[in-house]
Amino acid sequence: LSVTYDGWIDLFCWGTGNCPTKVSTDIFSPDTAFVNFVDWGINQIGNDKPNTWRTLTNEEWNYLTDGKEGRKNADSLCSVAQVDGINGFILLPDNWTCPSNVSFKRGVAVGHSEKNYAEHQIITLENWLVLEESGAIFLPVTEDNMYSYGNENSEGYYWSSTLKGKYSPHVYAYYFEFDASYAGCMFNSTSKRLFVRLVKDVK
């Protein structure tokens, strides 16, 4: 993604891997609400075979970002930034070491608005490519239908593969959310349209 990108960025209702255009009415009924998760990785992605990629579980998202439930140094293995003009959240591998030829500020910003990403740090595309090579992952802020106010440049929402439960008249699933000063897992209706970020298991 970059400020000049003008292609499609898709949002999905939960678990619609085999039917990405389907929209749940979110009524407690097996016919209309999403209960059985179908991973988006069921599709062929690039030259990889179907089911090579998958969606992170709620437990995995928590491991990455929650120092109480996951890795103890989670707070120092994440950051926020404006990367090549795009606001977003950065995840770092366990035992990560910053490359010597770039500067990097760990942790999140003090404020939670759009401007706080750039105030925390600005990373050029050249430097980001170095960080990416070292294992850093960038999650751009997202558009969504979660709330009515505009947050397309300040917050991010990414589905997990974990169902929360059926509480009539709603069906809920977990998702990962962030702004410039916060990151964590929440749950909401499976009818919400959010981003997905797939991963590949290391063998």
Q: Where would I find each of the regions flagged by the language model?
A:
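A short glycine-rich, aromatic-capped structural motif
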Residues: 1-37, 51-65
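C-terminal, surface-exposed recognition/capping segments
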Residues: 3, 16, 42, 48-203
